[in-house]
Amino acid sequence: MSKKPSKNTKRRTGKALVITIVVIVVAALIAALSPLFLPKQTADKVEGIVEKVVGMDSVVNKGYKKLLNFLKGFTKDLQAKNAPKVESARIEGLEIPAYIDGHEVVRHTGYTLSWNEQYLVADWVAYELTATELDTQEVSRSEDFRPDETVRRSSQLEDYKNSGYSRGHLAPAQDFKWSENAMSETFYLTNMVPQLQNYNGGIWLKAENATRDAARITGVVYVVTGPVLTDGPFETIGDNKVAIPKECYKALLVIDENGGVHTVAMSIPQNVGKKESLSKYLMTVDELEALTGLDFFIELEDDVENAAEATYDISYWPKSFQ
């Protein structure tokens, strides 16, 4: 006959169960609530540490993950409610960053750019991308690369010839299929930077596709994109010495249907492989501003801008950002 467990054994088992439940609850609360009080990167680190600790016990880990997923539903709702708000879901010119003294600003049909005559690349290219525009398939890719006569001094086709670098779009041609003229103007060399082909057709294309995914899901995305020009000196191509950026960036902003403002930014080095994920290069808009020396989304009210640019919520953006 098997022995019945003693009262002491039952007490020990009961205590162990209580301790296990307490550990699960505390761990899940820490991981789920940290995004409400900490910057995104710090909150991610906290969750990673907690996951390593609870992962040492399979029972605790299983219960922790179930409770964490449940709690995250509530924290996402709270984050949405606490997101900085604006009165209108559309703000005219919101995508335009602060101008740089002495730099030409050019407005084309679908985008606006700030031209850096020293480096012969744009400081930034800004445009509004909508789901409606992406659904319009009226125009095929024109491929009419050419200098931009609207600036005092443009890069030239010969600068890229046999250079080993592709003419990398900043505002992608695919985002402008809604207009033959808008599409054609994306092939101005002022909208190009020298990019390695593996980069241009690799992770940079991933960034472009992710931006389109965001526009299709949210309806409208405000986009600013360009090369990082604060980490020179730069190697150059061609007789005109077009600067080869070491990395390129994007800053994105969405205003949701309730007026909540959501931002995310990224800066991606040219030596990144095709298989790398975007998530490694995501950052806050504040961090991108510190990196580039630019000031984005200045049409927002100061308090809204400060709150929106200080953090980002990866769960708000499509899975292609991960």
Task: Give the predicted meaning of each segment.
Residues S2-Q322:
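Domain-level detector for secreted/extracellular nuclease and nuclease-toxin modules, and
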